[in-house]
């Protein structure tokens, strides 16, 4: 990899560390406030979803109109300053409202930085290296997802919330420094890029939607991602009930741990054994569902918890391969000037369908059942099969 690729990966890694530590430390601190904490933790989590829903489309338009590196620098700087100032909050009540406020600020920042980062990647990474870069990004993300909560627990438990916030501030500052050292010129900017108002933003968003509707391959990829996210949301709703469903106290933790291992394995295999084309993409998606389908018969066979959880390892492994090739294909097929808006559409639709899946799982009386894992797997399998038939007729 080039120096700029290393710097971009390092920036993303330390930025994610800051986000994970902030979310874990603050959620556990708020939850520890008792009845009051339960109410405010709901507010804390609701802020994320609402901001993502309303600001993702705007974030994509901004990412296409301005320099993406500057957007990332601004969001890192805001995160560093906000977390740093929060360490000086004197009272518990002030800290509580401060945490919710800063969480809203970070959620706003993420609405802009998430799409900007995915779109900025193509400025630094050559097309033939996109799959490899996205695989490295996934490996780093999974390692941080496993290790950062442990670090956050140690810091909050031993040192308290304020040192954790200071660590957050430092991580955002380090991410800023890594990005600052990248000087590659961005080529996606158009002559109109200096103008900005609500009308121009709405026009930009419409241009992005028109492009997605006009380009059948991009619309196809977006449809697949939306349907897959629906089933993943249903799976994520069901997963915390693993201990009760499988009558084992360690099922949930083991499923999560092996799922993370599967994601790392998927990132390692993505570029070695799968090509970046529709056939590989949809085969990986179709194979992934076997992991979920295995959970129900493995439970009935009364195998060990480790063997049972290997179904989630399989699922996450091939789902990660699908995700890596999906994002790489979008980055290759979409013009640089429109990447921000296309990615914002992907993220927005994902946010829209996740609550729908959760509502459906909540409303159905028998949804919390071991059989539901297999049904979700069947839904993913059917999606991949229909998508494969369509792609074979039109794109392959």
Q: What are the roles of these predicted feature ranges?
A:
Residues 27, 83-90, 152, 156, ...:
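Structural signal for membrane-spanning alpha-helices in multi-pass inner-membrane proteins
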Residues 1-5, 185-222:
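Juxtamembrane intracellular "pre-TM" segments in multi-pass secondary transporters
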Residues 13, 161-163, 204-265:
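A single, central transmembrane helix in multi-pass transporters
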Residues 78-86, 106, 171-175, 287-295, ...:
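MFS 12-TM fold signature
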Residues 96-107, 132-189, 253, 257-258, ...:
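Hydrophobic alpha-helical transmembrane segments
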Residues 7-24, 44-61, 67-82, 98-157, ...:
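Substrate-agnostic recognition of the 12-TM MFS/MFS-like secondary transporter fold
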Residues 54-56, 65, 69-71, 75, ...:
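C-terminal transmembrane bundle of multi-pass solute transporters/carriers
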Residues 25-39, 237-250:
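Short amphipathic helix-loop junctions that connect adjacent transmembrane helices
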């Amino acid at each position: 990899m080039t120096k700029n690729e290393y710097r971009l990966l390092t920036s993303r890694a330390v930025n994610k560390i800051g986000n994970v530590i902030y979310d874990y430390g603050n959620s556990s601190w708020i939850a520890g406030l008792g009845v009051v904490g339960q109410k405010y933790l709901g507010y804390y989590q609701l802020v994320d979803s609402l901001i993502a829903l309303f600001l993702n489309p705007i974030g994509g338009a901004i990412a296409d109109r301005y320099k993406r590196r500057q957007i990332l620098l601004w969001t890192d700087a805001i995160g560093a300053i906000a977390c740093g100032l929060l360490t000086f909050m004197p009272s518990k009540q002030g800290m509580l409202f401060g945490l919710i406020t800063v969480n809203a600020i970070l959620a706003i920042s993420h609405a802009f930085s998430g799409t900007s980062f995915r779109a900025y990647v193509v400025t630094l990474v050559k097309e033939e290296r996109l799959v490899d870069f996205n695989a490295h990004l996934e490996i780093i993300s999974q390692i941080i997802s496993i290790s950062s909560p442990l670090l956050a627990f140690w810091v909050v438990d031993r040192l308290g919330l304020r040192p954790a916030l200071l660590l957050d501030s430092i991580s955002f500052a380090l991410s800023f420094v890594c990005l600052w050292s990248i000087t590659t010129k961005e080529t996606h900017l158009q002559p109109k890029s200096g103008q900005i108002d609500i009308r121009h933003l709405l026009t930009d968003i419409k241009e992005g939607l028109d492009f997605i509707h006009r380009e059948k391959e991009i619309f196809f990829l977006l449809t697949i991602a939306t349907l897959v996210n629906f089933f993943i949301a249903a799976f994520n709703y069901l997963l915390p009930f693993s201990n009760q469903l499988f009558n084992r106290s360690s099922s949930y933790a083991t499923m999560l741990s092996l799922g993370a291992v599967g994601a790392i394995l998927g990132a390692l295999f993505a570029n070695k054994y799968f090509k970046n084309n529709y056939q590989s993409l949809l085969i990986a998606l179709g194979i992934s569902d076997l992991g979920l389908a295995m959970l129900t018969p493995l439970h009935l066979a009364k195998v060990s918890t480790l063997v049972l959880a290997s179904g989630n390892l399989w699922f996450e492994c091939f789902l990660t391969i699908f995700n890596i090739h999906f994002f790489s294909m979008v980055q290759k097929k979409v013009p640089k000037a429109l990447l921000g808006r296309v990615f914002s559409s992907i993220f927005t639709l994902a946010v829209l369908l996740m609550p729908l899946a959760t509502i459906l799982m909540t409303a159905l009386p028998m949804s919390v059942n071991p059989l539901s894992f297999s049904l979700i797997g069947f839904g993913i399998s059917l999606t991949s099969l229909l998508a494969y038939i369509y792609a074979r007729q039109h794109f392959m």
